[in-house]
Amino acid sequence: MKVYDLTIPISEKIPTFPGSPAPHFIEWDSLEQDNYNLEMIFLSTHTGTHIDAPYHFVKSGKKIHELDPSRFLQNAILVRIKSKANQAITKSDIIQYEKKHGKIPNGSTVIFATGWNDKSRKDFFSNPGLAESAAKYLVSK
């Protein structure tokens, strides 16, 4: 099994969503002072690569700590479809991918590599997405 790290490294310079605070790293203890190093990290739950919990948009939705972590560890199919700003991946795009690379197995977790991660990480509003036709097609499999 090949493992893909989907995260963006967190630093004080990471772009943050407009209105969100930048992360702060504070030295709390040091080897010289207490024989160990310890840092405090303060950051928004929307810093870097993250999962939006249902609570983010639904008042009675589950909060991030209430979600079972095992649901985020999956075997997945990596589908490379280059996309431009504000371009949706369609059912037709997925069918074309399957013709070239083989059918996506039923029940698969699908990760799309659009090339967008190579773009500026300051543009939060025009990234590619999934068209409704594509989402319905994948759910039907």
Locate predicted features.
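Active-/binding-site microenvironments in catalytic and ligand-binding cores
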Residues: 1-141
